[in-house]
Amino acid sequence: MSDKTPRKPTAFRLEQPARVSAASEQEEPRRPRAVKDLEQITPQADVFDLTDDEAAELEILDPAFEAPERKGWSLSRILFGALGILVSFAIGIWTEDLIRALFARADWLGWTALGVAMVALAAFAAIILRELVALRRLASVQHLRKDAADAAERDDMAAARKAVDALRTIAAGIPETAKGRQLLDSLTDDIIDGRDLIRLAETEILRPLDREARTLVLNASKRVSIVTAISPRALVDIGYVIFESARLIRRLSQLYGGRPGTFGFIKLARRVIAHLAVTGTIAMGDSVIQQLVGHGLASRLSAKLGEGVVNGLMTARIGIAAMDVVRPFPFNAEKRPGIGDFIGDLARLNSDRNARK
């Protein structure tokens, strides 16, 4: 038994909980007053974002494109031109001897060979004509780019209207530019400064194409990055980078209305490579390399995935250079894309693959 004395029975009152009416549940509207203590939300820093110094360094690596000056006849052009003429003579003499020999054997064989030779000659002439038209179209885009830049610099309304009319002609077969062309058609009789007209045409006609071009460059860079990360041989990486870059150059040229042929594509690829060589190209700054393979990303990217990011950035550089070459107007009203626009997506893509592993 317990030594404590049991408590005597006592009566006490229970407090009833206050009943809240439905009317009192509705809060009265707060009177307007100044609020000084606001809750501050500090966003977390993204490890893939570039610092100001790194972004400036990337901008230096991506200068704007300037069309090269036309050069005269070089020794290499004279050599290949002379060799081409000699090969044409050799093929003509061989074809003539073949047709004569077939006529000597049987007339129907000779006439058949002559007909086949005529068909081949007509097809060859059509191919040459198509290539010449494509080269002329590519040259007209380059001249239009220079004329638009000159008109915007001098604020020449007549030259600007001429350049805008040429741009509308090039973009006539592109469905994405229909709305912009209609807007410019409605402003035909309006008085607009030359510089503003160039900027307006660039915004209304080329902005949808720039958006799609960025998507093409980003997707090509992602494909190169993924293939590099999973390919077993370096030769496969190089081959796929060349294939994807060539396809990207052709697709960008077709997007902006260039439609290059075989020789036009070769000339266009040479211009892109020359642009890359002049601008310091594939090289990247030390701070960007440190961000890709060192510090916070070292724990996220393996060596193979790091190579994928670098190859993807190289493809993006080629795509940006191709945009500079094939775009009818220089970047003025619209922001020119840079490596910084793609580096974050490529790094996130490869870090996600590494995390899934």
Curated annotation (Swiss-Prot):
Region: Disordered, residue numbers: 1-36
Taxonomically, the superkingdom here is Bacteria
Keyword S-adenosyl-L-methionine listed? The answer is no
Q: Which UniProt keywords apply?
A: Cell inner membrane, Cell membrane, Membrane, Transmembrane, Transmembrane helix
Q: Biased composition, Basic and acidic residues: where in the chain?
A: 27-36
Task: Name a single GO cellular component.
Answer: plasma membrane
> What's the protein called, per UniProt?
UPF0283 membrane protein BCAN_A1047
